[in-house]
């Protein structure tokens, strides 16, 4: 929903008076978006409605911000996975999200910035460009970091 309706505007007024936020989402529109198969179809539908992103995406982003959460990524040959952590956590704490042994035996983290990965297109190209970071226990993980943890237990 781009503008909401009379009811949502009344809710917005109450929320504003209480210092709270409101996120207007149109359930039927979200159902229609979810029923589309491809990313391209979803994007075309959003464009036709004059929306930049779905309400579900906006809800997730707002919830992450409200809860002070961020995401780091791990990638192997068989799987790429996103992990949720609290903003401000250091590398060993984030390693512990995967497994407590990773945190206990933390040695270092190899870090690729998401923007560098997009720019160079592969881990090998990032390494070749000298953009792979080797970080220790005091590194504060950044949203979107691609992490490879080294540990010994």
Feature locations, PLM:
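C-terminal-of-GTPase-core extension/linker across diverse P-loop GTPases
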Residues: 1-142, 147, 152
């Amino acid at each position: 929903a781009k503008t909401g309706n009379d009811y949502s505007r009344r809710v917005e007024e109450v929320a504003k008076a209480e210092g709270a936020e409101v996120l207007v989402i149109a359930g039927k529109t979200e159902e229609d978006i979810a029923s589309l198969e491809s990313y391209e179809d979803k994007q075309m539908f959003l464009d036709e409605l004059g929306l930049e992103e779905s309400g579900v995406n906006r809800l997730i982003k707002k919830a992450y911000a409200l809860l002070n959460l961020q995401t780091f990524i791990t990638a192997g040959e068989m799987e790429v996975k996103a992990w949720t952590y609290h903003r401000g956590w250091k590398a060993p704490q984030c390693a512990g999200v995967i497994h407590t042994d990773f945190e206990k035996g933390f040695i270092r983290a190899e870090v690729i910035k998401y923007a560098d990965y997009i720019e160079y297109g592969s881990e090998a190209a990032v390494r070749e460009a000298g953009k792979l970071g080797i970080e220790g226990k005091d590194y504060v993980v950044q949203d979107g970091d691609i992490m490879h943890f080294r540990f010994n237990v």
